[in-house]
Regions:
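Short non-domain terminal segments
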Residues: 13, 42, 62, 115-117, ...
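A solvent-exposed, acidic/Ser-Thr-rich amphipathic alpha-helical stretch
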Residues: 30-90
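Residue-level detector of alpha-helix boundaries and kinks
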Residues: 20-21, 49, 53, 102
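Intrinsic-disorder/low-complexity, polar/charged segments
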Residues: 24-25, 60, 132
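A beta-strand edge to alpha-helix "cap/lid" segment located at domain peripheries
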Residues: 1-3, 7, 69-144
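Short, low-complexity N-terminal intrinsically disordered segments enriched in polar/charged residues
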Residues: 1-34, 38-42, 138-144
Length: 144
């Protein structure tokens, strides 16, 4: 496993079991911020990418947290399950299954998504979270 893949695995291990519940956990947030600062360039980009091409980009640790906060705002519970890591030079792709229960609902919604981590000098410079796995794989020239 490359150093970059090791960084991604470490970040994924640090991801909370329930992203919604972790929004108000100051200790978990501080630990995640410390790890992000350690493994990323100072103004790394977090991009949330929808299937229709819409995206939102924010910079730095606070941008990461605000992006995720907005994304999970409509959920009572939200979790990410790591399925596979794909390495491609300075890019690492995480294939993941997302599980969420909308606020006011009881049925779980499950989708297959992906995250693309772009590295420079073994530091994360860009993170893209894709709701559409096939679209993410096309971005890096892989077939779904």
């Amino acid at each position: 496993m490359s150093k970059n893949a090791g960084v991604v695995r470490e970040l994924m291990r640090a991801f909370p079991d329930d992203v919604v519940a972790a929004q108000d956990d100051a200790e978990a947030r501080a630990a995640a911020a410390e790890l992000l600062i350690e493994v990323s360039v100072p103004e790394f980009v977090t991009a949330m990418v929808a299937p229709d091409g819409w995206s939102s980009e924010r910079n730095g640790v606070e941008g990461f947290f605000s992006s995720w906060g907005e994304f999970v705002a409509g959920f009572a519970r939200f979790a990410i399950e790591l399925e596979e890591l794909i390495e491609r030079g300075d890019v690492v792709v995480v294939l993941a299954r997302q599980h969420g229960v909308p606020k006011g609902g009881s049925a779980e919604i499950t989708t297959d998504g992906a995250a693309i981590f772009y590295f420079r000098d073994s530091l994360v410079e860009r993170l893209e979270f894709h709701l559409d796995r096939a679209q993410a794989l096309r971005v890096i020239d892989l077939e779904a």
